[in-house]
Structures are given as C-alpha cells and as structure tokens.
A protein has these predicted regions:
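N-terminal intrinsically disordered, acidic low-complexity segments at the extreme N-terminus
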Residues: 1-17
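Extra-cytoplasmic beta-strand recognition segments
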Residues: 249, 312-363, 408-413, 443
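Extracellular carbohydrate-recognition regions
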Residues: 217, 227-280, 443, 449-461
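Flexible, surface-exposed loop/linker segments and immediately adjacent secondary-structure boundaries
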Residues: 13-18, 22-99, 106-230
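Short carbohydrate-recognition loop motifs
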Residues: 277-307
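Extracellular carbohydrate recognition and processing domains
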Residues: 364-419
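Extracellular carbohydrate recognition
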Residues: 398-405, 415-454
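Beta-strand-rich interaction surfaces with strong enrichment in secreted/lumenal proteins
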Residues: 85-87, 93, 314-322, 383-400
C-alpha cells in the first residue's frame, strides 16, 4: 500500500485553480442571472402594475331605449332580438331601426351611478355596431371615456354633456371605412350614406378622417362638413343657424312667467300653468335619467282642461326674420311618462307634449301658429282625432317613459306659400289635457341656407341646408 504523504501532490495546483475558477464563474453567472431575472420581474411587475392602475379600462354601462316603434338588436350570440322598451347593452351590439322607429343609446359611468357620459339618438333607417365603450378602471388614471361605433349607415344625433370631469371621445366608422371623431361637450349631427357623409358640429371639436388616414378635415363649432366617399373630397359650409340662444331647460334658463314685458328681454323660457279647475299643473327643473330637464306635471285625478306652458320669445318678442333661410326645422328632446286622455283629447288639441311656433306670415298678415303634438296612450274604442284643427300633420305616438328626439320636416314645405313664415316670434312647448307627466330637455330651431355644392357632390345643393 502506497500512501501519499502530501495530498496536494495528487492534485496539481493548476487543476485545482481551474476548477475553482469554473465554479466561481458558474456561481457568478447564477447570481447575475438571478439578479437580472429579479430586475426583469421588478420592471415587468412595475409596468404591469402601472398599466393596471393607469391604462386598464372597464366597460361603460350602456342602455338602449326605444323611443318609437321597435328596434333590432343583435348581441354577441348573433341572435337578433326585437326591442320595444329599454334594456342594457354590451360591446359588439348591432342596432338597427326601420322607417318608423327611433332609439337612444345612453352611456353611464359605472363608478358614478346616474352620471351620463353621452347620448346617441339613432334615427330612422339607421344601423350601427357598438364596437366598444370604456372608462379607466381607476380614478387616478388620466384616460377619458371612449365610445366606438362601426359600420354606420344612417343618421345620428350625439350629445356630450358639459359637466364631466373626464374627456369624452366618440369615434365613428362609416361603412366606407372613413372615420369621424367627436371630442368635448357639444351637439353633433351625422348622416352617412353610400354617396355622402355629413357631419355638423355645435359646440364641440370634430374631425373627418379618411379611411387610409392620409387626410384629416377639422370641423369647427357651427360648421358642417360633407365628404364624398368615392373621391374623398370634403366640402365645409356654415351649419344651419341655431335661432334659440341656450335652448336647454335648466335652472339658469327657466323662469316663472309674471306676464311683464321685461321678461321678454331675458334669454329664458317663461313658464306658467293654467287650468279650468283644480288642481293646477306644476313645473320643476329635475334630473331625469342623468339629464337636466323640465318636468310638467298635473295629477290629482284632474278631470278638467289644463296646460303647463313654456314660451321663448325671439329677439325680445320682436321676432327673427327668416326670409333669408331656405329651411326651417325644429329639434325637440322630450319624454312622456303618462297622460289620462286618449291620444290628444276630443278635439286633438290636448297632447301631453305639444310644440307651437308663433310667426308672422309673408306679406305682413295677422300672426298665426304652427302646431304639432305627441302622445303615448290611445284607446281604439274612443275615436278622438289624431290631428287638431290648426295642425298640418297628424300627431305622433311615441313610447311611454322613453326619451324621444323629434326633428321636424322643413316648416317652409309644410305650409302653403302664402302662409310661409316671414318672422318667428315665439317657440312654445307645453303639456295639455287633464292629467299629464312629461319632460322637456331642449327645444331648438334651425334656419339653413342652400349653398351650391362643387362637382364632386353632384347637382343637389339642397343637402347643405337640410336640418342638422
């Protein structure tokens, strides 16, 4: 047996040193790799946490309310349903109206119950895909509200309130692939067809963007832009003129009428009630479904005629000359909860919502009025007329408890040539009948001029002056 006296002699120094270096390198590699992985995890976690806190989103609460007729709704299950009342909707909902129906899309902030972010009126013969609606997950995020609509064909009215703490951005894609963006509080009117895309802006910021993103046309306040989808040409003209200053019904714009001429100088709705017997109707500014509106209410089992009226004098009661306009149209936003009479009463003059325009006809004849009414209840066993003696059109039936955006035809075309308005003196909205419960949010009057359009838009220049 041979015993090595010096163990180190069995392991040369060079071999020991090489192995030690390799071990050290492996150890350092593991340590540095772990540190790098730790750093990556920290950065990734930080970025993920930042995204979650600042950039992640949740869906808005979306409500579909049918104001008239029935509306088609196709959800993610691809089964088309027919909706008459109200129901909650989600992303990727396809909505369509026919020639007689209208719907309203209302978007609410789920973190602040009742806070209305935007409303979109879907007018007749319109289809769209609600692609997305979102808000930031947490309040500390600086993101705004986002609503995206795809494949629009038809007409919309978009309202973004002015009392929100976050920016609202509505993005709309036409069936031709062009884009429209709406940002900031305001009122926007859109009309999209295969031959023409129209955007009208009152109060907000808007833009038309080509499908390829190559061109962008900004549309300022009180402007209207028309795009030819085939050529991409965009033509900008003045929007129809809003003839009523501050048309909304708010605490600042509604006063109780005292019958004095001094009130005519105020840009306000002068409201009052009359009745043939107790009780007298009442009016109050309220918050209804997230919007400010005037409620006109008469209950108590009333069996006599009564009215609650709000009148707006134009130009301090002297009237506004409209002879320079080619079109004249009303846009009224209202809701009827209920009324006791069938239709509009035995003479067709007691509707729970009626609109009256007082005007001086051409030639300076005696002042006259144009009327139009709306109702929700009709008893087929009671043969009340659907038109009043002074009306040019039948009254309209709308759905109970639903906001409805009425847009009139051109008033000039509804009246005979010798009765065409020369000056508008008053615009009046009122509830009439026995019992009634109605709301008015706004009443607008627009005057438009038919400007000739350039060649890319064809020969029909009338579109430039149509109602918003």
């Amino acid at each position: 047996l041979h015993i090595v006296a010096n163990p180190a002699a069995a392991f040369p120094a060079q071999a020991v040193t090489g192995r030690s270096l390799r071990q050290q390198r492996v150890a350092w590699g593991v340590l540095l790799g772990a540190f790098a992985l730790f750093g990556v995890l920290c950065i990734g976690t930080g970025l993920g946490l930042r995204y979650f806190l600042l950039d992640s989103t949740v869906a808005l609460q979306g409500m579909l309310t049918v104001g008239r007729g029935t509306v088609g709704l196709t959800s993610t299950d691809l089964i088309e349903q027919v909706v008459r009342g109200s129901r909650e909707i989600a992303n990727s909902s396809v909505i369509s109206t026919d020639r007689q129906s209208q719907a309203m899309l209302s978007f609410y902030d789920p973190h602040t119950p009742g806070e209305l972010v935007a409303t979109i009126t879907v007018r007749t013969d319109t289809a769209l895909d609600l692609a997305a609606m979102s808000r930031p997950r947490f309040e500390l995020s600086g993101l705004g509200y986002e609503i995206t609509l795809n494949d629009l064909a038809g007409r919309l009215k978009v309202i973004i309130p002015d009392d929100l703490t976050r920016e609202v951005r509505v993005t709309i894609e036409s069936q031709a692939g062009n884009w429209i963006t709406l940002t900031g509080s305001g009122e926007y009117f859109l009309e999209v067809s295969p031959n023409l895309e129209i955007l009208t802006n009152y109060g907000g910021s808007a833009a038309m963007i080509a499908a390829d993103g190559a061109t962008t046309q900004l549309v300022a306040d009180t402007q209207r832009a028309l795009r030819n989808p085939e050529t991409g040409e965009v033509y900008v003209v003045p929007a129809p003129v809003s003839l009523i200053q501050q048309p909304q019904f708010t605490q600042a714009t509604v006063i109780e009428s005292d019958g004095t001429p001094a009130q005519l100088l105020q840009p306000a709705w002068r409201c009052y009630s009359v009745a043939n017997g107790d009780p007298t109707g009442d009016f109050n500014i309220v918050r209804e479904n997230g919007r400010t509106a005037l409620q006109m209410l008469r209950g108590g089992g009333a069996r006599t005629h009564g009215e609650t009226l709000c009148s707006r004098a134009l130009n301090a009661g002297q009237g506004v000359d409209v002879t320079g306009f080619d079109t004249l149209s009303l846009d009224v936003l209202f809701k009827i909860n209920s009324h006791s009479l069938s239709a509009c009463g035995i003479e067709g003059s007691e509707c729970p919502v009626m609109v009256r325009v007082d005007y001086v006809p051409v030639g300076g004849g005696p002042a006259t009025s144009w009327f139009h009414g709306f109702f929700v209840t009709f008893d087929p066993n009671i043969t009340n007329p659907l038109v009043c003696a002074s009306c040019t059109q039948e009254h309209e039936v709308v759905n109970a408890g639903a906001w409805y955006s009425y847009q009139s035809d051109n008033l000039f075309s509804l009246l005979p040539a010798n009765a065409r308005p020369e000056a508008i003196v008053n615009v009046v909205v009122y509830a009439s009948g026995h019992e009634y419960d109605s709301f008015i949010a706004s009443a607008e009057l627009f005057g438009g001029i038919r400007d000739p359009l350039p060649a890319p838009f064809g020969e029909s220049g009338e579109i430039a002056a149509d109602a918003p």
